[in-house]
Amino acid sequence: MLNRRDFLKATGAAGVVTLGGCAGGSSKATGHVVVVGGGYGGATAAKYLRMWSNGSVEVTLVERNTEFISCPISNLVVAGEKTLADITVSYEGLRKWGVRVIHDDVVGIDTEKRRISLAKQGELAYDRAVLSPGIDFMWDQVPALKNAEAQAKILHAWKAGPQTVALRKQLEDMKDGGTYALTIPKAPYRCPPGPYERASMIAHYFKTKKPKSKVLVLDANEDVVSKKGLFVKAWTDLYKGTLEYRPNSELRDVDVANRTAILEFDKVKVDVLNVLPPQRAGALVAQSGAKLANNRWAEIDWLSMESVNVKGLHILGDSTLSAPLMPKSGFMANQHGKVAAAAILNLLSGEAPSTEPM
């Protein structure tokens, strides 16, 4: 049987395992766990810490947003198939599990004293902390987009929320016969199939509503990095003449005023330019002192999701240095949350994290 250690450390393959039961839960566990980030990883960890401890562990979730907006399926909003309200939920479900939810920003973390400083609501002491801050963008790689004014014109919409709606409006306002271009950074990045999905859905929108319009995919990678067969078949069978895919097209910068993508050997002017910048772990991970690979992604012990160099600090989701074949996805963040919850409960009980399958 493939055990959890072998799976997480060796394969990391999504879709071949379900981490379902309480492998590490223990009613002997006590203490206070602070979870920062209420996305798929953090919210899952908070819930299962309460569930698997039978309520004996105190859990506080710190999340700046008052509602959760799902990044997975947000492309449906961009394509006009759903509204932002359709993919938005409250945090009341976590409160029902006994999770204390605080809406605030983290401004500092002292991992030696095990204290987290909030912008408005003082400090939180913790026995163990979970960071699940998602991604931040490497704006220095796209110099023209370093300022907020430029970012409001050339959108990423890779964090679901206002930019999701704004990108939809840009597409609606674009004249029929215009061109939408999507730039994709070199992997790894959040949600490997997501850009190709977005391009395909916008191609469908154009085909049905703006048939003279075009989709141009400028991919820094040498080929489609996820689900290639499915996407290429769709582009050939359904969107031939509507969608053009260009590999090895790495973005160097942007001419914001003229909506132009500046590539190494070309400049591409379009009507709607959608730039996905290179990405790294959320800034809080670096601020915590956690070891980063290539100054980008957190190195962790996959058995416990604990930082390799900061004890008591567990890091989840897109911020981690992914194992081979493990995508940065909501599904995997959910699994990370369960693995971390089980391991933390073992550790708070004075036990080692379980190596048994979950």
Locate predicted features.
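A Rossmann-like FAD-binding core segment of flavoenzymes
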Residues: K96-I109, K113-I116, L124, H204-R296, ...
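Glycine-rich, N-terminal phosphate-binding loop of Rossmann-like dinucleotide-binding domains
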Residues: T11, P133-G134, P277-P278
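Beta1-alpha1 glycine-rich phosphate/pyrophosphate-binding loop at the start
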Residues: G25-R100, K186-K227
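N-terminal secretory signal peptides and thylakoid transit peptides that target proteins
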Residues: M1-A14, L19
